[in-house]
Amino acid sequence: MKKIVFTGGGTVGHVTLNLLLMPKFIEDGWEVHYIGDKRGIEHQEILKSGLDVTFHSIATGKLRRYFSWQNMLDVFKVGWGIVQSLFIMLRLRPQILFSKGGFVSVPPVIAARVSGVPVFIHESDLSMGLANKIAYKFATKMYSTFEQASSLSKVEHVGAVTKVSDQKNPEPDELVDIQTHFNHKLPTVLFVGGSAGARVFNQLVTDHKKELTERYNIINLTGDSSLNELSQNLFRVDYVTDLYQPLLELADIVVTRGGANTIFELLAIAKLHVIVPLGREASRGDQIENAAYFVKKGYAEDLQESDLTLDSLEEKLSHLLSHKEDYQAKMKASKELKSLADFYQLLKKDLS
């Protein structure tokens, strides 16, 4: 039986594509394995998926771009993770390793290359993260969501592979209940803060609940169960799975962070959106770059977190609603998306 090893983690964005691809390989008779951190979100997501995947936990160390005494300890963790991954590779002898990035992916990528296993990696952001910069040196091929520099000879630009489906599913009962609390004469605004929510969005909704719910129906994915609430023109929930796409479809506008997975999902369904990227003090600036790219393409509006107020947000929302047709036309004309089926066929072709 053919074997494939997946890796990637730290955030949901480093796991999502793997979760989409693994069922395809399982259906085609592959034995599927995953290397990650048993304490990480990658392990949680695989357990929730119920997929027939064997998980292998390794030691991980965070890759930092700044000086920290923890770097010394993490060098040893990464080294031990490489040794553990090498033993896994030599025992399994897989035909391929597929990496979605994140610091947990570096040891398996290095181990795969050392043991002669072809390495395929995927980069979602406009600029490569540190983990993928290292992984690229060991990769057989890299697939990218955005176009990359021509000097990167192993990169193939494939566009975004999203989890949003074109199929219309029956409305969940919970969605019907939510809609009974909404005023259908008002626009609906969905706040999406990534897998763990966004404190800045939660605080804005908490501080301005009265003003917001007088003008909009508000959906707030918080990442914090203590904020859960369903009341007039307001639905706050910590986490959703099957309800995610129905909520996207219900919303007129989405206010989101600038993670590539989320904004390309919005592009795929031509949903109006305001991007509030993580600042450079909290990230490497990749979300700022992603947001600027989407604004330049005419897909979205952006708003820096330091400038986020009720008034500044309402100005962006009003502008999007007033120019809805223009934004949606540009999104619908985009050639930057690839179906999961097409990407899977491309990956299989490259393996042959």
From Swiss-Prot:
Transmembrane segments: none
A Pfam family of this chain: Glyco_tran_28_C
Gene Ontology MF term list: undecaprenyldiphospho-muramoylpentapeptide beta-N-acetylglucosaminyltransferase activity
Coiled-coil features, chain-numbered ranges: none
GO cellular component terms listed in the entry, alphabetical order: plasma membrane
Leading EC class: transferase
Keywords on record: Cell cycle, Cell division, Cell membrane, Cell shape, Cell wall biogenesis/degradation, Glycosyltransferase, Membrane, Peptidoglycan synthesis, Transferase
Pathway participation: Cell wall biogenesis; peptidoglycan biosynthesis
CDD domains: GT28_MurG
Statement: the UniProt record of this protein carries the keyword Cell membrane: yes
Localization: Cell membrane
Sequence positions that bind UDP-N-acetyl-alpha-D-glucosamine: S195, Q287
Membrane topology designation: Peripheral membrane protein
Record function comment: Cell wall formation. Catalyzes the transfer of a GlcNAc subunit on undecaprenyl-pyrophosphoryl-MurNAc-pentapeptide (lipid intermediate I) to form undecaprenyl-pyrophosphoryl-MurNAc-(pentapeptide)GlcNAc (lipid intermediate II).
Protein name listed in UniProt: UDP-N-acetylglucosamine--N-acetylmuramyl-(pentapeptide) pyrophosphoryl-undecaprenol N-acetylglucosamine transferase
